[in-house]
Amino acid sequence: MKLLITSFVAMLGILVGLRSVINKVHKLPELDLQKWWGSGSRPEEQDESIRPFKIDFNDSMISDLKQRIKNRRRLTKPLEGIQSEYGMNTIYLEKILTYWVDKYDFKKRVELLNRFPHYKTKIQGLDLHYIHVKPKANNGIEVLPLLMLHGWPSSSKEFDKVIPMLTTPKEGYNFVFEVVAADLPGYGFSEGTNKPGLNPVQIGIMMRNLMLRLGHKKFYIQAGDWGSQCATHMTTLFPENILGYHNNMPISSRLISHFKLVIGSLFPSLIDSDRPERVYPLKNHFKYLLRESGYFHIQSTKPDTIGVALTDSPSGLAAYIMEKMAICSNRDQLDTPHGGLANLDIDDVLDTVTITWMNECIVTSMRLYFRQINLLNHYFIFNFSIPTDVPMAAVKFLYEVTYQPDWILRDKFRNLVRSTSYNFGGHFAALHTPEVLADDVFASVKEFIKFHSTSKYKSTYLRYPHSNLICSCQSALKFRARIAHS
């Protein structure tokens, strides 16, 4: 008995000590909020003008693109009985390349892209491109600023289906959105930097500076993929500016969160997970990540090398981009020629490829992966450990790259005021399920407003302190006990 008590005390001591390490919260780093990312050194006088911009698919670009596709070398056919398991099915790719040359209407597509007002302005030395749509609101309808941030390999084009839904008054809501959809630096029509170190933290600073230039000291954010990384850092660094954060790729990267995932796999009965089948067994998730993360490792280590091939060949660029857009739209369709790409409108997909091709920005977009992995940027890593009190809403689509239950998300986002899960949809929510995304943004912002307007709306983090592992397990056990006795 004495040995048992001693062992229990020792184990408890280990857990307490381990918790103090993995649950450590670092101090906010000191950052230069006007760091110069343009060529050379910062000039004494800076251009802060806002310039109208038009997208142009010019004849020279179109002619060169088509000629390169027509002159491509013979593509290697898939193995017998293989569809998309080895990557892009080249028989299916041939059909898309033919469509791109013969049927993709470049002029019609550019007119569609230009239906929104486009602008450029220099932020910290880089020419940033953004879409800015102001709604025509009726009396009594409040206009709320919303910053939208995309990821790889996209641009602000990703939001062209959802923008009209967000800028149109919606029945049951007394507000509508003024949308600012920005291209991340080095993506789309935004200039890339020639200086190392421009990571998601620094991009978050730039996006805040963009909104301040547009006159918005307080605003909401909607983001996914890399955009969600940038936005998460914004909520950590600038909570006074962010009224609410809608995230369609919600992740807590705190060490305590990763520890909980492991504990949950060992003791699943202790874990209060809303959809455990999306998390466990962990080996299935790791198997998926191992299978599909080859591009991540390439872009995180030697982006410039693979960039040579992708910059020189539109056929190669199309295959590279479309294969990832396919798998992120439905990972269960590898046994089909399209591999999941059929879930997206092919014109939307080719818009993304064409924009990347014409701007020669595949290398500058991929370099963001290298900067993410560079551990020398210690403040970037430390930022993950700092919780934020900015209210956050999570929307989780079935085929998102990763999934975390709410009790883990609260480690980072202490005021998780809304969470919805869907048994459909994927990573490119604004293209794949724009109506659902727009509806969720409206509903979430309504919760954000409620959060700010009433003192009775307490933080779920305070009611369920899941950052404490022991409390997490106790809460789950008490919850299950209530269910058992009801």
Where do the model's predicted regions map?
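Terminal signal-anchor or tail-anchor transmembrane helices
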Residues: 1-30
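C-terminal subdomain of alpha/beta-hydrolase-fold enzymes, centered on the catalytic histidine
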Residues: 13-15, 299-466, 473
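Non-catalytic accessory segments flanking enzyme active sites
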Residues: 61-134, 360, 364-378
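Glycine-rich "HGGG/HGxG" loop immediately N-terminal to the catalytic nucleophile
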Residues: 106-108, 157, 184-198, 232
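Short beta-strand element of the alpha/beta-hydrolase
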Residues: 142-151
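Conserved alpha/beta-hydrolase
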Residues: 166-189
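Conserved hydrolase catalytic core segment
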Residues: 169-174, 217-259
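Conserved acidic catalytic loop of the alpha/beta-hydrolase fold
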Residues: 201-219
